[in-house]
Amino acid sequence: MSNTVVTGEVLDKSIREVVRILEDAVGCTAGPKGLTVAISKPYGSPEITKDGYKVMKSIKPEEPLAAAIASIITQSASQCNDKVGDGTTTCSILTAKVIEEVSKAKAAGSDIVSIKNGILKAKEAVLTALMSMRREVEEDEIAQVATLSANGDKNIGSKIAQCVKEVGKDGVITVEESKGFKDLEVEKTDGMQFDRGYLSPYFVTNAEKMLVEFENPYIFLTEKKINLVQSILPILENVARSGRPLLIIAEDVEGEALSTLVLNKLRGGLQVAAVKAPGFGDRRKDMLGDIAVIVGAKYVVNDELAVKMEDIALSDLGTAKSVRITKDATTIIGSVDSSSESIASRTNQIKAQIENSSSDYDKEKLRERLAKLSGGVAVLKVGGSSEVEVKERKDRVEDALHATRAAVEEGVVPGGGAALLYALSSLDGLKGKNDDEQWGIDIIRRAACAPIKRIIKNSGSEEAPCVIQHLLKQNDKELIYNVDTMNYANAFTSGVMDPLKVVRIAFDLAVSLAAVFMTLNAVVVDVPSKNDAAGAGAGGMGGMGGMGGF
């Protein structure tokens, strides 16, 4: 394997081509009238989706230079997805436009550093303007925000609003596939979520979404650190014989114990995952007790308990209908053995502690525990007549749920690309130090119009320039263009709102990514040599040598 260095016009041309391909594929999904994309799979039928992030991840050019450029862009999109769970499509549209405009500046021989300074100066002004437009989302507007993010599906919007009403704005809402034919159902169940993720990515069962997903697992709870596997070996053996997964919640799992669990998982043995217990000190002890009540565990093993880890039987462990673990959080859904009486008793105990406490801090922490214990979990069950239909609908439900959470967290701004358009007024008095810096400011002025133009284009209309001109003339920052009705309306009365957090992060990341490409002078890429190609072709089973490793 040799490599080559790509620079100059060849590099710039490749960047433009890759960005255009990504924008064409991802941008077509924008807006309520956006189109779907089919993604082929190694096995089975193609997946149909309107999820911009999923489309972007699936694009893997064969040519090494194009693949390297696409990888850089996808990493940025993944940051958008990780931070807010939505906005990838907007991010890709903005990135493509900024890079297109920067390419023109480069071709004209402009100073790239000055242009970059102008772009970053304009970015800060636009972000400040976006913040000034925000307003808190009202409870009756939650359905509208979710509907817009679900590409106009009012059923999804109303069901998400129902979930928020049942478990509260800070409650736990999850999405899972249903075996039934109903499009979408809401099920409220006992459960809890806490801010601790898996201790090793090797525990992941869903590699595409980097999740651990267990059905009907056993749950072992301890306040102690687990360093040696010997102490939990009887538990592991008993659970392995049952054929069910195991979740370990402990102060920590490290050293030999963690490496043994990972090795066992990689070899296809026991389905197991470990997470750290939430909280610290006495609060950790209390929260483990809360979890034990929810999952029906008889013991939380600690130094004060007469029962040792080695003596724990299957009947002493907790159970749940399902468990979902990300790198940051663990969600336990639907206890199996826990009774409503035990949860009621525990909540009454916490309420009494709140009444008797004189510390505001302690009261706040007790209220947090009470909310987690009594709030439960709302499960959005997605069904359909085919696997393709279910997966496409599930993508939209997840996007809508992320958008709803973002709206609750930071508020909303006028939707349909209008917020970025109106934020451009902040650039009117902004002047660059020189012509090239001013060019950078003007690049942001043109790029910020790209999302609304794309949304209008996806609706089948070619009237974007006229629409933009009309919106800016009215001097009303709540006015939007509704592509569903092909008419102008008030953003908040018509329900065409975007979560500020989604717009803000998508814009910020897009400009930052474009700035990276602006100063990119060379890319070193691997090029397969003739000897590599000959070696790969010798012997049809030659590729099996890697089976011995991980």
Curated annotation (Swiss-Prot):
One of its GO terms (cellular component) is cytoplasm. GO terms for molecular function: ATP binding; ATP-dependent protein folding chaperone; isomerase activity; unfolded protein binding. GO terms for biological process: protein refolding. Together with its co-chaperonin GroES, plays an essential role in assisting protein folding. The GroEL-GroES system forms a nano-cage that allows encapsulation of the non-native substrate proteins and provides a physical environment optimized to promote and accelerate protein folding. It catalyses: ATP + H2O + a folded polypeptide = ADP + phosphate + an unfolded polypeptide. The gene is groEL. This is Chaperonin GroEL. Pfam families: Cpn60_TCP1 (PF00118). It comes from Anaplasma phagocytophilum (strain HZ). ATP binds at T29, A30, G31, P32, K50, D86, G87, T88, T89, T90, G416, D498.
